[in-house]
Amino acid sequence: MHIDTRYVTRYNINMIKSFAHKGLKEFYESGSKKGIQPEHAPKLGRMLDRLDASTSPQDMNLPGYRLHPLKGDKQDMWAVTVNGNWRLTFYFEGQDAYLVDYQDYH
């Protein structure tokens, strides 16, 4: 069978490519709250859905998320506020998010 590629639609899907936090990855993939603060689950779910659909850090600049770049040895990374001192951190390479982490870094 031969497919004429002139008529094939190609999709370039941007997405979260990697996680630094095992519990966050499990929450994202299965909904399990065992590796995260359970009270953060609703907001984390919204943030991860948004991040998965984002093509740049600026797509995460929503009211209440407090998007900000990190400094020092993490200068290529960005953070959004989950609750209190808890942050969702990530960096973009091209239009994909990498090393998505969930941490209390203050």
Enumerate the language-model features and the residues they cover.
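Short hydrophobic alpha-helical module
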Residues: S30, R50, S54-P57
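Enriched for short, Lys/Arg-rich terminal
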Residues: M1-I13, K71, W78-H106
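N-terminal, well-ordered alpha-helical segments
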Residues: R46-D49, H68, L88
